[in-house]
Amino acid sequence: MAQLSLQHIQKIYDNQVHVVKDFNLEIADKEFIVFVGPSGCGKSTTLRMIAGLEEISGGDLLIDGKRMNDVPAKARNIAMVFQNYALYPHMTVYDNMAFGLKMQKIAKEVIDERVNWAAQILGLREYLKRKPGALSGGQRQRVALGRAIVREAGVFLMDEPLSNLDAKLRVQMRAEISKLHQKLNTTMIYVTHDQTEAMTMATRIVIMKDGIVQQVGAPKTVYNQPANMFVAGFIGSPAMNFIRGTIDGDKFVTETLKLTIPEEKLAVLKTQESLHKPIVMGMRPEDIHPDAQEENNISAKISVVELTGAEFMLYTTVGGHELVVRAGALNDYHAGENITIHFDMTKCHFFDAETEIAIR
């Protein structure tokens, strides 16, 4: 088991490209941390610096209180699973899982015990004598996980391990990795560009953009209390709707909208001196309802209808604004149809239009 401390971590390449900027994070023992962000945000580079595969340009990496910057990768007690399974095609599943242990000259009976234990956890016992070519993509990924598990490392690092799998297998493997974390009870750091993976697996999420940490928090926290517009738009599918406007009395107004703001949210706007400058209102698709209430209703025209099974995603035009509305599947909706939508203003978010930081 392991605690990690990343203190002012920097990564600058020889061409002066600054990939990771002042990265700070404390990771407790047994946490499941997910680094998430768009391509090129620095998440995989940060993971590789933890693993010892990339040199740290500045700052300190501590594992269990020991500075690891100059410690070689093989001495960090870390196991890593990559996007590509990197299995030896000529070896059996057993030999692939045992290979690293054999290189460490660990006793054969210990190797046998660990491999069989990992195979039992991962449901691979019946495949131990097969070669990777005879396995499905999900099974090959489990072998790669097994190869990491048998090392009994203090930290497990996973770099987009599910991105080569189809959608159904990704869902299945998400659950398997979460169960694996519970069984092993060890520290895991996982990199993905998929916010759904981050939301469903992490104890805490680290959202990155352009090498900078935007927010760190539990999935529910970053979803309900995003630090800025980037986080609000990145976490959640479909993304949060954004509308630019101003405050007029107790109303959020645009050229075509006038919505009443609840007193508690209006008080925050007053405290933060946001009443007389442009702001951005954010609304999750599930907080805009296709039915009329006493106030905060407006007519919308449906442009696209997506049925996901249990619900509809309605892509609508509202007074020049493009908004996504999440609706139950009890009613039918059609492109070109006009509907009345209701804004649940108790759930709205406000952001500074200039800095894009949440107003709280």
Swiss-Prot record:
Domain ABC transporter: 4-235
A Gene Ontology biological process term: carbohydrate transport
Keyword Repeat: no
Gene Ontology molecular functions: ABC-type transporter activity; ATP binding; ATP hydrolysis activity
GO-annotated cellular components: ATP-binding cassette (ABC) transporter complex, substrate-binding subunit-containing
Coiled coil, from the record: none
Record PANTHER family: MALTODEXTRIN IMPORT ATP-BINDING PROTEIN MSMX, OSMOPROTECTIVE COMPOUNDS UPTAKE ATP-BINDING PROTEIN GGTA
Protein's recorded name: Uncharacterized ABC transporter ATP-binding protein YcjV
Organism: Escherichia coli O157:H7
